[in-house]
Amino acid sequence: MSERRAKIACIVMASGEGKRFSSKKGGKLLAPLGGIPVLKRVLQALPIEEFCDVVVVTRWPEVETMCNTMQIKCVRHDNPLRSDTIREGMRAVIDGAADPSDMPDACLFVAGDQPLLTTCSVKCLLQTFRDAFGRGQSAVCRLCWKQEAGNPVLFPAAMFEKLRSLEGNRGGASLLRRADMKGKGIQDEEIQNKEIHDKDNQDEGVQVLIVEAGSPYELMDVDSPEDLAELEAVLHG
C-alpha cells in the first residue's frame, strides 16, 4: 500500500512523417482539424497539472515552435525509428529528474495524431493507475474501445528499462505479453469481471488495465487526408 500520490510523466510521440499525408512541413501533425492543428488538439486534451513532466518528441522544427508557444517542453531528434522516439522521450523524462526521489512512477505515452482524444479519458487512465499504485500494484493502463486496446498507454516505472532498450520500429506495445487485462469504463468506472489472457507481461508481475474511451474516434489516428476528413465530419456531426 502507498499513501503517496503517484507521479506520472507524459511523452507525446510527434515524430511521424505522415508520408501518405502531405509534403508540407509538420505533415499531418500540423494539419488543421476544425481550424486547430491535429497535434495542438492532442496537447490541449492533456491535463498538464496532473503530470510531473510533459515532453513532446519530434523531428519537426515547426512542432518545436508550436510547443514553445504553448510552453510545453519539446525534444527534437533526427533518428528514423519509433524506438528512437521512445528512447529520446525517456531520456528527457529521466534526465529531468534532479533527484532519484523526483523520478516518475509511470509514464503515459500519447500519440500526437489522435486529435479527438479527450481530457476525460486521459484523467481516467491516470486515476486507474493511481488507484492501483495506492494498492501497491504495478499496472499498465491502456485506452480501448469495446476492449480493443489502443493508445494512449501508461507504463509503470518497472518497465522503463525495457522501454529504453527497444530497438528498430518496435513500440511499447511490443513489450506487452500474457498479462491479465481488466476493463474499466469511463461512464460507470466499474471494473468488469472478465479477464483477457492476451498480450501482456505477466512474468513482470505487471497487470494490464484497459480503460474504455467515450467513443471509438478517440483512438483514431490521422494517417491520410481521408482520415482527417472523417474526423472533421465527426467533429461537426
Regions found by a protein language model. Name each.
Residues 2-4, 40-106:
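Conserved N-terminal catalytic core of the sugar/cofactor nucleotidyltransferase
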Residues 14, 58-59, 111:
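Short beta-strand/turn micro-motifs composed of small residues
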